[in-house]
Amino acid sequence: MNDIGRIIAAACLVAALLFPAADARAQTDARQAWSAASGSIFEVEPTWPGYQKPGFGAPAGTAPEGTGIAILRPGLLVTAAHVVSKATEVHVRTPDGTRLVATVLAIDQKTDVAFLPVGIETTPIALAQERPETGAPVCALSNAFGLGIGITCGVVSASRRTGVGFNHTEDFIQTDASVNPGSSGGALIDLEGRLVGLLSAIFTKDSDSDIGVNFAVSTELMLESLPQNFR
């Protein structure tokens, strides 16, 4: 074997040894993130007047489902405003499957954030103290297509995006973690399970499906939208 052949063989051996270990670590981190945060994630089931095209598994007359996050204090959820802004009523489904009526406390259309009190004790999600850096690993916990809460993972594609054109006031974290209809209002978390953003928008020109350019409202902007008496 010549020198080039030896170099190639050595490189292949290193890749074989390192990549499975890296993949295993990523899977472990995702499991840890899920374990830390999933107990704070709710399915949101709005009913919109005159809606004729229910989401997967939704009763006739209801709108496509969304997601909500327990935050700050027991009994308070946050979701995307566009999930509930047209709703005549809103139900949520807890992590253990209990279905409850929720009320809409406040809607901030400028930031696409809404707050929902629910009549039970909830486990608020931990909040990240710092904005994640570009390239940092993150996971999205959401109710994609109304199928129930699940997890997808990726990286922060950009730590701060403004002027995208979805909302009047924007402070987005961009990610390639998979996001789809039903994910709105879900949690973008770090690998410790701490909230870094509220899933809000999918950038696509052809259909409402994931192409890897997705946006979450930063926790800083989300908290600015909270009514004063709840801060």
Segments from the language model and where they lie:
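Bacterial N-terminal signal peptides
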Residues: 9-20
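Gly/Ser-enriched beta-turn/beta-hairpin loop segments
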Residues: 53-61, 105-112, 159-173, 205-209, ...
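Sec/Tat signal peptide C-region and signal peptidase I cleavage site
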Residues: 22-26
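Conserved active-site neighborhood of the chymotrypsin/trypsin-like protease fold
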Residues: 49-50, 65, 72-149, 223, ...
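C-terminal cap/linker of serine protease catalytic domains
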Residues: 27-36, 44, 48, 140, ...
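Bacterial N-terminal signal peptides that target proteins for export
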Residues: 1-11
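Flexible, gly/ser-rich surface segments that form the specificity/activation loops bordering the active-site cleft
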Residues: 29-33, 83, 124-130, 134-170, ...
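Catalytic nucleophile loop of clan PA
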Residues: 69, 178-199
